Amino acid sequence: MYKRQAPILPIDSEHSAIFQCLVGEQSPIRRLIITCSGGAFRDLPCEKLADVTVEQALRHPQWEMGAKITIDSSTLVNKGFEVIEAHWLFGTPVEKITVLLHPQSIVHSMVEFEDGAIKAQLGTPDMRMPISFALMYPRRATRPGERFDFMAHPQLTFAGVDRAKYPALEIACECLRRRGTAACTMNGANEVAVAAFLGRKCAWLDIVRAIEYALGRASFAAAPTLGDYAEANDEARRLAAEYLAL
């Protein structure tokens, strides 16, 4: 990318939104604001999370997605990975990346500039929009049937994320601060834990616990090679399986 000056066009809705907000801008940014639906359990009290079922976790309030990413959305692991992704795509330090709860999933992300102005990208929660943007860039696809009805969405609300309810978000941010193989370890452990949850071999809360277990015991390479990443992934999977007694 750097050698050839070739742009990377993101298709994740949040990062596509940030990219679109940055087009034509030359001034430094103050922060990136990534929005978050809150997943299947955004309205569920913390004390009830211990007993949630696979079926409940798969009922995403806004998006229709595969099982793995829907579970990641319910734990906010995916949002943590999106923070990491935003850092590497846009060169933004974690301290300048904010995550806001936005239940309507209409504002896909925002960028705040040094003068206090904020640009946002809005649209219905439909992955065809960011995908078509990436495919057609720098032009836009013609979609005559796509019309946003503001009257159908009279309220757009935002709130901070409950870090106690969703510890995975801060875990991911800490992995980004540590760099090295930390995020790889988190990813490997999460994949094993999510598969176990979907297979009804562990509880929903065990997903993040398995991640914490792996991160607390895994070896760490500060300047990893490709081989180090492969080893970190294997070790994380083994540690997660060990914690879950698989």
Regions from the PLM with identified roles:
Residues K3-L246:
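Catalytic, metal-anchored helix/loop core of enzyme active sites in primary metabolism
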